Each structure stands twice: as structure tokens, then as C-alpha cells.
Design a protein with these regions (language model features):
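Membrane-interfacial terminal anchoring regions of lipid-handling membrane enzymes
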Residues: 1-732
Length: 732
């Protein structure tokens, strides 16, 4: 019987092949669903779909094949063998609409009864929803959208029309498995288990749709009206009118122009267009995009309003993060972009892709400040995901810049006033093997004037497509739950009536702390890329040159030391094979090879060394402890462990501030000792036991001594700068 059903399913999949040409779904999670979601192939799987749909089931079947997941061949009554999978519909469809029934479907009730009688039966319930068309639409619907837009309550006839219209804009959501055994064991009244499961699954489906589609879109007239009616904006208009009572209408029109200048106008059609363009662009200029810790993105989005807090390396950051979020089945965030990007045609495209624009300086313009603040409050109240760059502008040096807290203060102020869906701050590390604008950064650092963004620059950017820029890296850092953070900083915030107060007195200090924590989390999520690692080694060596064998050995040792003593919980090392790293660095960067019999030499000329310092600065904080410890041995053969601890702790307050490191006293002692042990295990130091533990450097003629000097060279110029500063201060 089961073989007949299996053959029948395969026949239906084959029969539907022409129809599937219209269907090109993206899958969330996109890379390895079984691993990311924790689906155990050794246990039976029951895929649960919200409504009965043969097309949905065929789409699921095809993609289970693609990702090596168990295929839904059977109905639940045939389920039981390891590696087998079945399917279940929570709701059956009538001709025009679903058949409403508050009871659990009979197959689910039967499966629960089987599991209650058979204690060895363990089934994984995997909720699956297919979103036909990712357009969140506006609050009012056209006739076309009423018929062709995805509707979870669509009947069979409407579903066919939806598939025809939306097949190329489809999202297949696969949820985390729910343990049937755990649900049964946790329920005292077994008769209610099936009903409870049905409710749990419905919540999953509702959250899937919410994350995938986001809030309803707004139009310009709606946002203009809501912002201008806000009390804070009306007060700002009143203040301006007091100076010139006869021109209130002119001031109101000025406020309206500000709203139009600021407001995003997201359109799903433009988002899809940008996604297609960016997909082509990334393939042309990058070897790939590496994304880390994206597996908890959707979990966060289901429970919180996500505010992305990203470091800023390049103009590409705006597009890259939105692209990554969209590819993971979520709505791209509203992104705060500089007004310098609001030029034709880029400004219009970015605005319709979800960017809103802000001036670099508000310059005491209280009316503009009130309008911008109220627009941010509007987005927070509506539940839109946000993205902003706390540094305020692109880093010209490769290091994180001190945060500018204005945007974060507006977001936090809007949240404590409106008390909407809980907010999570999600810091994001963005890095590149080659930053497109790096040469213009160097020109500006040398005193050159920043060139304004223009259409001419855009046309000139075509030459970028002729080059390859290595890889791009996006790492999602440890999230900061705003409610928990506020509870720690100001426990009574929930009890205060802040709805009419423009800005609580305690908010400024809290925002500063939150910004500092966010920056620390960004650096904690560092991606140690091949280019950055090679640049760090080359720039720390004398004359910016290293024999290939020496470079390979240093990379091997450095990778082991920072891996074993990795004090960065969210950080990662992109590549760990030294030969692979050097080969990739030669291909992408400006490192030159000079061939010599027996041992080639790799070299950076002076101009290229300045460029490579940008990439070294991306990861220099990873070497804080090993490089600082190595510097104690440049002029001393032996140093006691206690002297090392005291010396490192004397410098750490300065380095922690400069590199955004947030380590407690206990962490510092643990990290220092861990680094000492790792340096000893890798031959850079020699441990001498006894009542007073001591460390000795290798003999000068040893290869390991050269590696120790290179390790020390990473921070040497920074430590010399501290020394010069202290010497000058001491002379007064």
C-alpha cells in the first residue's frame, strides 16, 4: 500500500514538471536546512503544511530532494520507520475557501494516540509554509491583489491563480522540528495534546508569514500626515512660528518637505529588481559572500523588532546587508543612509528599496530634528526592521570609529514611549577582502578633499565589473535584548509614564552604554579573513617582506594561537590552511612575489603597504594579547608570569578603549593565562616552572624567535605611540 502511494507521489511530481517551470522558490534556511534546524535524519519526520495543497506538497517534495531531507512520501499512519517522512495538512480546503474546524485533524489525533501507546515512537513535526508572493502590500488592496496575492485562506481555484501569478516570487519556509514525544510528556491531559499541537503549529505559521512579509507598507501621504500631526512636530512648528507669526503655513510646508526628503518609500517590485541586479553584481565582483550566525536571524525576527547595528566599511554595506537578509527569507530593513546618496537615479532606487535619508549634521535645526525623530518613532511603532551605522560614516582606517549615538537615542526614545513589540539590537560585522573605495580613503587621510557622490561616479563605476574583489563577510554578533538591557541600566523604566516626555533624563547615559556594548559586540564578531591575516603578518615584519616559508610558519602559528585563545565568542577565522591563505592573498591583493632558488620572498611596496594597513586594522584587536605579551620579550630574555600579568593589565585599559574590548577582570586573567599557554605550546615562549612561574623567549638564532618578533611587531607602533604620549605628559 505504501509503495503504491510512493509511486503515486513520484508520478504526480513528474506530471507537475511543466507547472514547476513557473515556480522558483527561495528556501529559508537556504544553505543546509537539516543542520541549521537540527532535523535528525534517524528519526521519522512529519511535515505539517497549513492548508491542503497538492502544489505546495510537490514544491516541498522537490526541495527535500534537493537538500537531502527525507521526502514526504506517506500519510501519517504509515510513519514510524527511521528516515521516513510523511505530510499532514492542518486545514482542508473547500472549492473557494478553507473548511474551518477548531479540532485537530484526525491524522494528527491518531498519531498522538499512537505515540501515547508506543513510548518508543518519536516523531519530528516540521512546520512548512510556502509564501506565494513576498509583497507585503499596502493597507488598501487593488482588485488584482485581492485575486492574485497570497492568501493563507485561499480556496483551490484562487490558489491556482496565485501560483500562476506569483510562482517566481515564492518563499519556502522550513521551521525547526517540534518533538512529539516532548509535547506528550509535558501534557498532563493527553486528550488535549493534539489540540495544543494544532495551536502551536498555527503560531509557527503565523510567525513565518510575519517574518517573511513584514508589516503592511505605508504610502507617502500616510506618513506625512502622521508625522506632521505628532505633538513634538507641532511644538517645533509652534516655536518656529513664534519668531514669525505670519508664516506658520510656510513653516508647515517646510516640515512637509523635510518628511519627503527623509521618508523611505519601499516597493516590493524595486526590492526584487535590486535583488536581481545585486545577485549579478556580487557574482561579477566577489568570489562569494560568507555569512555567519545567520541561523538565529529568523528566531529573533519572530519575537522581536530587529534593529541591525552595522559597522561601516563601504557604500556597498547598505546593499549587502539588505541582500543577505532578503536571501534568508526576511524583509530587508529600513536603512539610514546619508543624504549624499540622494542623487538621481541612485536616491530614488535606494528610497524604494527601503532607505531613508538623514543629513550628516542637524546643525541645531530643531524642526528637522523633530521631524526626523518622529519618523523614526513611526517606523518603530509600525514594527519595521531598521538598520543604521553607529559610526556615522565609513571608516577610513579600517578600525571601528567611536559611535555617534543620535540614531540609537531616537530608536530607544521611540521604544520607551510607545512600548511596542520588544526590540533587539543586532550588531553586525561587515568585512571585505578588498574595499572598493580604499584608495579614496587614503587620499582623504593624506589631506585630499572628499569627492561628492554623483551620477558621473556611478557611470565610472562600470570599470569595477572588470575586477574581482575577493570575498565579502557578514557576521551577526551577539544580540542585545533592549528590555533586559534597560532592566539592568534603569530598572524602574517600565513603571514610568514616558508617553508625553520628549526624552527621559536617564536615557543619554543608557544610550551611551548601549552604543559601547554594541561596538564591542561588533568587534567580538570579527571575521579573520585571508587578506587581513596576511597583511597583519607582512606589515609586522622588517621592510614588509617575508620568506614564503617564514610567512607560512607565522600564519600557521598565529592561527593556532588566536584559535586556542580565541577571546571573541562570535568571531571566526575564514581560512585556516596557510598555503591556501597565501595563494588567495596573491590573487586578490597587491602582494608581490620575488622568486629565489629554494625560498621565494613575498613583499609589499610602500604604497601597497598603506592600502594593506586598512585590512590589518580590521582584525588587529584579535592580536591584542599575544602581541602585547610578545613585546615584553623584545628586550628581556625572561619575565615572570606575575610581571606579565601586571604589565598586560597596565596597558589593557588603553587598548580595550581603542579596540572596543569589554573584558571583566576575571576574563582578563583567564585570557592572559590561556594566551601564555598557547604561545608556549607553539614554541614562541618557554615555560620555566617553580614557585614563581617564569617565561623565557627562544634563543635569537631560533626560527621561533623571528616569529615572536613578528608577533610583537603587530602592536609595536601603537605601544610606541603610548610611550611617546606618556613621555610628553611626564615632561610637564
Amino acid at each position: 500500500m505504501s509503495n503504491d502511494r510512493l509511486n503515486s507521489m513520484r508520478f504526480m511530481v513528474w506530471l507537475a514538471t511543466p507547472l514547476m517551470w513557473l515556480v522558483r522558490p527561495r528556501v529559508a534556511p537556504a544553505e543546509n536546512p537539516a543542520k541549521e534546524l537540527g532535523i535528525d535524519p534517524a528519526k521519522p519526520v512529519l511535515y505539517v503544511l497549513p492548508t491542503a495543497s497538492l502544489i505546495d506538497r510537490i514544491v516541498l517534495y522537490r526541495h527535500c530532494k534537493q537538500f537531502n531531507l527525507p521526502t514526504p512520501d506517506f500519510k501519517p499512519r504509515y510513519l514510524g520507520e527511521p528516515g521516513k517522512a510523511a505530510y499532514l495538512y492542518l486545514t482542508k480546503l473547500g472549492l473557494l475557501q478553507p473548511l474551518r474546524d477548531n479540532n485537530a485533524p484526525a491524522p494528527l489525533s491518531d498519531l498522538v494516540a499512537r505515540a501515547q501507546s508506543d513510548k518508543n515512537l518519536e516523531v519530528q513535526l516540521v512546520p512548512v509554509s510556502i509564501i506565494w508572493g513576498r509583497d507585503p502590500a499596502r493597507r488598501e488592496k487593488s482588485l488584482f491583489k485581492l485575486v492574485f496575492a497570497d492568501d493563507e485562506h485561499a480556496g483551490m481555484i484562487q490558489k491556482v491563480l496565485i501560483v500562476i501569478a506569483q510562482g517566481r516570487d515564492t518563499l519556502l519556509n522550513i521551521g525547526k522540528p517540534i518533538s512529539l514525544r516532548q509535547q506528550i510528556d509535558s501534557q498532563e491531559d493527553n486528550s488535549e495534546t493534539a489540540r495544543k499541537l494544532r495551536r502551536v503549529l498555527r503560531v509557527h505559521f503565523r510567525q513565518h508569514r510575519q517574518v517573511s512579509l513584514g508589516p503592511k507598507l505605508y504610502d507617502r501621504a500616510e506618513v506625512i500626515g502622521e508625522v506632521l500631526r505628532a505633538k513634538s512636530v507641532q511644538q517645533a512648528i509652534d516655536r518656529e512660528s513664534e519668531k514669525d507669526p505670519g508664516n506658520r503655513r510656510r513653516i508647515e510646508l517646510k516640515a512637509q518637505r523635510y518628511v519627503k526628503e527623509i521618508t523611505a518609500e519601499p516597493t516590493h517590485g524595486v526590492v526584487r529588481f535590486l535583488r536581481a541586479v545585486l545577485h549579478y553584481l556580487w557574482q561579477k565582483i566577489f568570489h562569494g559572500i560568507e555569512t555567519y550566525h545567520s541561523e538565529y536571524l529568523r528566531d529573533l525576527a519572530e519575537k522581536y523588532e530587529v534593529v541591525f547595528m552595522s559597522c561601516h566599511r563601504s557604500h556597498i554595506d547598505y546593499l549587502l546587508l539588505g541582500y543577505v537578509v532578503f536571501e534568508h527569507g526576511m524583509v530587508p530593513p529600513h536603512t539610514a543612509a546619508g543624504i549624499n546618496l540622494n542623487f538621481w537615479p541612485v536616491g530614488s532606487l535606494l528610497r524604494r528599496g527601503g532607505a531613508f535619508f538623514l543629513r550628516r549634521k542637524f546643525g541645531g535645526n530643531r524642526l528637522y530634528t523633530a521631524v526626523f525623530n518622529e519618523y523614526v518613532n513611526f517606523l518603530v511603532r509600525r514594527g519595521h526592521a531598521l538598520n543604521f551605522f553607529p559610526e556615522g560614516g565609513r571608516s577610513r582606517t579600517g578600525r571601528l570609529l567611536p559611535p555617534k549615538t543620535g540614531m540609537l537615542a531616537m530608536i530607544l526614545n521611540g521604544y520607551v514611549r510607545s512600548r511596542t513589540k520588544p526590540i533587539v539590537i543586532l550588531p553586525v560585522y561587515v568585512g571585505y577582502d578588498h574595499v572598493v573605495e580604499v584608495k579614496s580613503y587614503l587620499r582623504e587621510l593624506q589631506g585630499g578633499k572628499k569627492r561628492p557622490e554623483t551620477i558621473g561616479q556611478l557611470l565610472g563605476a562600470r570599470k569595477l565589473l572588470r575586477k574581482r574583489y575577493g570575498k565579502a563577510y557578514v557576521n551577526f554578533a551577539k544580540p542585545i535584548m533592549v528590555d533586559e538591557f534597560l532592566d539592568q541600566q534603569h530598572p524602574s523604566w517600565r513603571d514610568e509614564d514616558l508617553s508625553h516626555e520628549s526624552k527621559p533624563l536617564w536615557l543619554s547615559k543608557t544610550v551611551d552604554e548601549l552604543a559601547e556594548q554594541g561596538m564591542c559586540n561588533i568587534n567580538d564578531a570579527v571575521v579573520v579573513s585571508p587578506i587581513a591575516l596576511t597583511a597583519t603578518a607582512m606589515l609586522a615584519s622588517p621592510k614588509r617582506a617575508m620568506a614564503e616559508s617564514e610567512l607560512l610558519k607565522f600564519l600557521e602559528v598565529a592561527i593556532r594561537i588566536i584559535s586556542e585563545g580565541m577571546n571573541f565568542q562570535s568571531g571566526t577565522i575564514s581560512r585556516t590552511d596557510p598555503k591556501d591563505i597565501v595563494s588567495f592573498a596573491e590573487e586578490v591583493s597587491s602582494i608581490k612575489r620575488f622568486k629565489y632558488p629554494g625560498n621565494d620572498v613575498l613583499h609589499l611596496n610602500e604604497a601597497d603597504a598603506v592600502v594593506m594597513s586598512y585590512y590589518r586594522n580590521n582584525i588587529i584587536h584579535v592580536f591584542t594579547l599575544p602581541s602585547l605579551i610578545a613585546n615584553f620579550f623584545l628586550y628581556q630574555e625572561e619575565v615572570s608570569e606575575q610581571a606579565i600579568l601586571d604589565g598586560v593589565k597596565a596597558f589593557l585599559p588603553f587598548l580595550k578603549r581603542e579596540f572596543f574590548l569589554r573584558w571583566s577582570d576575571d576574563d582578563e586573567n583567564q585570557f592572559i593565562r590561556k594566551t601564555l599557554h598557547s604561545m608556549t605550546d607553539n614554541g614562541l615562549l618557554i615555560h620555566i616552572g617553580g614557585s614563581s612561574p617564569t617565561y623565557r623567549r627562544p634563543i635569537v638564532a631560533a626560527e621561533e624567535y623571528g616569529l615572536l618578533k613578528t608577533m610583537a611587531g603587530i602592536l609595536q607602533t601603537i605601544l610606541e605611540r603610548y610611550g611617546i604620549t606618556l613621555a610628553i605628559l611626564g615632561s610637564f
